[in-house]
């Protein structure tokens, strides 16, 4: 098997569409004020199904995870450390774990946290001027009738966002605009909560 970006991402997180859908259903069933160590990760599998391979493209300290494969010195250094961290895992996971520990980790906003905040404050329309990997969007999507407008400049994410919105029949209330949000005239939008997390 060749090491394509898609293959690499699946070797680290091989999430089926069914697993992703189940994760979204669990998020939709999460009650207000019920987040704990057992369920605060709910929703991340769903997002990783769509966005994980793109998260691996993000450069931290000058290197994306994919860049490591092109840099023999860095690869050897990280794989050596990865083998010590997780000697029984496959080499790609060893490399990924070492990358996250020694280079950096590209995290997502927890959809469960976003959902809980929305349930607590009861907004009708969210404005998010830095949508990123979709955590706040998915929190909004999980609540019927809640509107969300997000902005992001990473056009590579458009196809995945479109799939999420279309497959959940939420195009009437969930919107993502791929543009620099500083160019938007927010006075033309209707929203009663601004909730964002810039990079």
Summary of predicted features, one role per range:
Residues 1-41, 52-68, 73-199:
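Class I S-adenosyl-L-methionine-dependent methyltransferase catalytic core
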């Amino acid at each position: 098997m060749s090491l394509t970006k898609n293959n690499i991402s699946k070797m680290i997180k091989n999430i089926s569409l069914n697993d992703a859908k189940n994760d979204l259903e669990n998020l939709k069933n999460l009650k207000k004020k019920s987040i704990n160590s057992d369920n605060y990760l709910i929703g991340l599998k769903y997002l990783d199904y769509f966005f994980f391979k793109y998260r691996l493209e993000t450069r931290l300290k000058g290197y994306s995870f994919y860049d490591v494969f092109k840099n023999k010195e860095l690869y050897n250094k990280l794989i050596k450390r990865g083998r010590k961290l997780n000697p029984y895992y496959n080499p790609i996971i060893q490399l990924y774990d070492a990358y996250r520990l020694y280079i950096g980790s590209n995290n997502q906003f927890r959809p469960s946290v976003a959902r809980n905040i929305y349930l607590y404050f009861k907004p009708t329309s969210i404005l998010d001027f830095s949508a990123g990997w979709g955590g706040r969007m998915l929190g909004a999507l999980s609540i019927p009738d809640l509107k969300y407008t997000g902005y992001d400049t990473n056009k590579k994410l458009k196809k995945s966002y479109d799939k999420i919105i279309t497959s959940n029949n939420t195009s009437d209330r969930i919107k993502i605009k791929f543009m620099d949000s500083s160019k938007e005239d927010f006075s033309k939008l209707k929203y009663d909560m601004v909730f964002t997390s810039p990079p």
